[in-house]
Design a protein with these regions (language model features):
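N-terminal lobe/hinge region of extracytoplasmic solute-binding protein
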Residues: 45-92, 124, 184
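Gly/Pro-rich hinge or "lid" segments in bacterial periplasmic/extracellular proteins
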Residues: 81, 163-213, 217, 226-227, ...
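Aromatic- and charge-enriched surface segment that lines or borders ligand/interaction sites
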Residues: 88-130, 288-289
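Surface-exposed binding/hinge segments that line
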Residues: 91, 95, 100, 133-173, ...
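Alpha-helical secondary-structure segments
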Residues: 116-122, 146, 150, 187-188, ...
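Detector for C-terminal structural segments
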Residues: 195, 199, 206, 300-332, ...
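Ligand-site clamp/hinge motif
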Residues: 206-250, 400-402
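Ligand/substrate-recognition segments at binding pockets and active sites
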Residues: 355-426
Length: 539
């Protein structure tokens, strides 16, 4: 038996042992696995297991607000509008300074009632964690009665409902040291067993306020990618998260389901010249080449995004032109443009004085060739492949990418000087503030390109302080493009947005994962579990 086959057999046996030990599968006489239709085995990718546990007040679920064990006051539904969860109703004052939530009378998985006191406790504890964010404008939290809570704000914050929808809540009585390893809450499931690095078993919460979930037991596998693939091929996994390098792999008895996500491949383009700004941590800032807006515009107009989707992503993706996706309510449709226009890109460069005078294929200006260092995480093969393809495309415009795989520490040290190819994206408009608000330049991973446009800064400030999301959306749209300027390609770009990633799953025939969002949040695999209480086998 060769080594690869031996490893595959070992992987299948290992997963079968894990699952079999949980009573998930039975082996009938014909040798084919028979499925208990009250259970399922799920694999959500190699990074789906939270290292610090399932504690939302420590940052778990903060990207998308999805949790098996807790519930939120509100959540984003399929069309990206706000849907009531534990809150049965809510009101916002006209001045945007008061948010009042009326609560459903619900119970936790341990049978104890969940009240306004637990809501207050959750938000006050979450405010202590820097990973949660956007809670700084809460002045006080008032408990009007056991099932009504009022948030008093220091100033209007149009993003507060997004924060509410992103924060699962915990019961005060159960929140103790080690909570993340044995969580109690109002979510659809309760933890039974967690063997870190291997699997987690959960059972339906019989107190769940939406009704007992269809599936009574779930097993989540936390194994390496090759082990998971072999187990999926053997029929031991019902929902299998498919990485791009396995996108073409066929799994008998399963169907591929793909969903657009807000997660994207993007290249940062530093906008200032070297020495034009000072970093508080003394990191080098500025790039001689990308500080010229002509370079940044040419790259955006000239690359062929669809070819990246077709050739690297196996068709499971879509071109991305900006952080903001067309599906969200704060998207400005005027920022749309046509890419793969190499002639336009060359014209932009020539008009700005970038010309190939020595015939070496690289344009230069004032003695400076258009050589650009592009960093990408050395451990991410897909990013390396994207980097190579956009490098080939940049050559068509006379721009030379110098590819340098780097560790996270090395990237952090040079992120304001060199271009960084990364994964990024969100459904939350707060990310426009993180990426494009001038005063954020140099603060950790915020505004790494040192973008600073006074009109855009003003629009972002107006959007964030608007009394409601509807008014804020108009300012977010102007920040993208107001007819004269903006952070989009039509204005003053500081990023090269490349492609939206699809989340792909091989789902067993006869198994339903329900209706999914039109645009999935950029999460570590858990996005599709937002409606997990409705998952189940066909009758």
């Amino acid at each position: 038996m060769n080594k690869r086959l031996c490893a595959a057999v070992s992987a299948v046996l290992s997963v079968a042992f894990l699952i079999g030990g949980c009573g998930e599968l039975a082996a009938p006489k014909d040798g084919k696995a028979s499925k208990d239709k009250s259970s399922a085995v799920i694999y959500l990718g190699t990074r789906s297991e939270p290292r610090m546990g399932f504690d939302p007040l420590k940052g778990y679920a903060n990207v998308d607000g999805i949790s098996l064990f807790q519930s939120n006051l509100l959540k984003l539904n399929q069309d990206l509008s706000f849907e009531k969860e534990i809150a049965k109703d809510y009101q916002i004052s006209e001045d945007g300074l008061t948010y009042t939530f009326q609560l459903r009378e619900v119970k936790c998985s341990d049978g104890q009632p969940f009240t306004a006191e637990d809501v207050k406790f959750s938000f006050e504890e979450a405010a202590k964690c820097p990973l949660v964010g956007n809670l700084q404008d809460i002045k006080s939290i008032e408990i009007k009665n056991p099932y009504e809570v009022i948030f008093h704000m220091k100033q209007p914050n149009s993003l507060f409902l997004y924060t509410v929808a992103r924060l699962p809540l915990v019961p005060k009585h159960a929140y103790k040291e080690g909570y993340g390893q044995n969580p109690v809450g109002t979510g659809p499931y309760k933890m039974v067993q967690w063997n870190q690095g291997q699997q987690m078993i959960v059972e339906a919460n019989e107190n769940y306020f939406k009704g007992i979930p269809r599936l009574k037991k779930l097993t989540f596998l936390f194994v390496n990618g090759e082990t998971a693939l072999q187990a999926a091929k053997a029929g031991d996994i019902d929902v299998y998260d498919v990485p791009y390098n396995y996108a073409d792999v066929k799994i008998s008895g399963a169907k591929m389901k793909a969903f657009k996500s807000a997660g994207k491949y993007v290249l940062s383009l530093p906008v200032v010249k070297p020495g034009a700004a000072i970093n508080p941590d003394n990191k080098p800032v500025g790039n001689t080449v990308t500080s010229d807006i002509a370079i940044r515009k040419a790259l955006n107009y000239g690359i062929d995004r669809q070819s990246i989707v077709d050739n690297l992503m196996h068709g499971y993706g879509s071109p991305a032109y900006e952080l903001v996706d067309p599906e969200v309510p704060y998207y400005n449709s005027e920022i749309a443009y046509k890419d793969n226009d190499v002639e336009k890109a060359k014209a932009i460069l020539a008009e700005a004085g970038w010309k190939d005078t020595d015939g070496n294929g690289i344009v230069e200006k004032n003695g400076q060739e258009a050589n650009i260092i592009v960093m990408a995480n050395a451990g991410d093969k897909m990013l390396q492949n994207v980097a190579m393809l956009i490098s080939d495309q940049a050559k068509r415009m006379g721009i030379n990418f110098i590819l340098e795989p780097k560790s996270a520490e090395e990237i952090n040290a040079r992120q304001h000087q060199d271009c960084w190819l990364m994964n990024y994206g969100s459904l939350d408009p707060m990310n426009m503030f993180y990426l494009y608000y001038g005063p954020n330049a140099g603060k950790g991973y915020y505004n790494i390109s040192y973008f600073n446009n006074l009109k855009v800064n003003g629009y972002i400030e107006s959007a964030m302080s608007a009394p409601n999301a509807e008014l804020a959306n108009e300012f977010w749209k102007k920040a993208q493009w107001d007819g004269e300027t903006g952070f989009s390609v039509r204005g003053d770009p500081s990023m090269l947005w490349i492609a939206n990633k699809n989340y792909m799953y091989q789902v067993k025939e006869g198994f339903s994962i329900g209706e999914q969002q039109s645009l999935q949040p950029a999460s570590m695999g858990w996005a599709i579990t937002r409606n997990i209480e409705r998952w189940g086998w066909d009758e």
